[in-house]
Regions:
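Rhodanese-like catalytic fold shared by cysteine-dependent sulfurtransferases
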Residues: 1-20, 24-62, 67-117
C-alpha cells in the first residue's frame, strides 16, 4: 500500500503503532500554516538528496505535504524505491485538518542571546 488516509493515521496513532512521520511541506507553506501533525519531523523537500539516507527502513514511514499530491507522493515513491515502507497521507495536511484531527504548534524559533558590549 502506498497511501494512508487521515482516519487510518489517526487510528495508528491511537493504537501506538510504531512509524515515522515526515512533514515534507515547502518551508513557506509550513510557515504560513504554523502547525504540524504532532510528532512529525520536517524535511525540506527540495533537499531530499541530503536527508534520504537518514530515513530508516526499520519501520513504516508516513509522508505528508500540504495537499497529498506531487511532493508527498513523489517522495513516497522515492523512499519506496530505496526500500522504505513509505506511504503518503491522502489529502496531506489539508485532509488531516478537514477531518478535524489535532495539530501541534511549531516550536518557537530560538533566538541567539543578545551580545552586550
Amino acid at each position: 500500500m502506498d497511501h494512508i488516509t487521515p482516519a487510518e493515521l489517526a487510528l495508528w496513532r491511537a493504537q501506538g503503532h510504531a512509524f515515522e512521520l515526515l512533514d515534507v511541506r515547502r518551508a513557506d507553506v509550513r510557515a504560513q500554516h504554523g502547525a504540524d501533525i504532532a510528532g512529525a519531523r520536517w524535511h525540506d523537500p527540495a533537499a531530499w538528496l541530503d536527508w534520504k539516507d537518514s530515513i530508516s527502513s526499520a519501520r513504516p514511514v508516513v509522508v505528508y505535504c500540504a495537499k497529498g499530491h506531487e511532493i508527498g507522493q513523489g517522495l513516497t515513491t522515492t523512499l519506496r524505491v530505496l526500500g522504505v515502507d513509505a506511504r503518503y497521507l491522502v489529502g496531506g495536511m489539508q485532509g488531516w485538518l478537514a477531518e478535524g484531527h489535532a495539530v501541534a504548534d511549531h516550536p518557537a524559533p530560538s533566538t541567539p542571546p543578545e551580545r552586550t558590549p
